[in-house]
Amino acid sequence: MKEHVLVILPHPDDESYGVAGLIALNRKKDIPVTYACATLGEMGRNMGDPFFANRETLPLLRKQELINACKEMDINDLRMLGLRDKTLEFEDDEYLADIMEEIIDDVKPSLIVTFYPGHGVHPDHDACGEAVIRALYRKKKEDRPRTICMAITRNREEVLGEADVVLDIKEVADIKMNALRAHRTQTEGMLRELEEKLKNNEPVMATWFEEEIYWTYQWND
């Protein structure tokens, strides 16, 4: 199977926080990456630091920020799915799975990255991951692409075990930082603090730009 990475996440900036290193490493190998972003994050509370957005302008700003971040990561196949922020958990399960199945069948990925259902903390994260997995369960097990997931709950290792995919992303840390910077409304204040902590070599913050970890989804059929 030809290599092709498909990232399916609910919000602009989810990809930059959690998957930018993986994306950049694959693009450096000239492996195509498709990013399907379910919403524009238009219900987000952050409006820049200092404020430069408002509730009316935020959707278009976040759309452009997403486009800018994808340019930083060299993603040339960005698909905006047009779902409403903070509503994914209320959508019909099969309807969401239909959307994910259509993308998967079109892209024919060798690798899918999404949130691990039940370990996304945010309801949209879990609903997105659940929809992807539901779509994949419709396929024969041997026809499912490799699927790795982000898990950000505090009990993730207790429930899932240790992450089995650990990527060294130090060589693309600058790309990850620039992708995060692109999401200005969401990250400016945080990045100022982060960069100060990085200067002081605070270990917890430094690991953000040293490695990304994922869990291979465990099928139960």
UniProtKB/Swiss-Prot annotation:
Cofactors required: Zn(2+)
EC code(s) of this entry: 3.5.1.-
Record flagged with keyword Zinc: yes
Signal peptide segment: none
Coiled coil as UniProt keyword: no
Disruption phenotype: Mutant has normal levels of bacillithiol, but bshB1/bshB2 double mutant does not produce bacillithiol.
The entry's keywords: Hydrolase, Metal-binding, Zinc
A molecular-function term among this protein's GO annotations: hydrolase activity, acting on carbon-nitrogen (but not peptide) bonds, in linear amides
Residues that hold Zn(2+) according to the record: 11, 14, 125
Catalysed reaction equations from the record: (S)-malyl N-acetyl-alpha-D-glucosaminide + H2O = (S)-malyl alpha-D-glucosaminide + acetate
Similarity remark: Belongs to the PIGL family.
Chain's role: Involved in bacillithiol (BSH) biosynthesis. Catalyzes the second step of the pathway, the deacetylation of N-acetylglucosaminylmalate (GlcNAc-Mal) to glucosamine malate (GlcN-Mal).
NCBIfam families xref list: thiol_BshB2
Protein name: Probable N-acetyl-alpha-D-glucosaminyl L-malate deacetylase 2
Originating organism: Bacillus subtilis (strain 168)
Encoding gene per record: bshB2
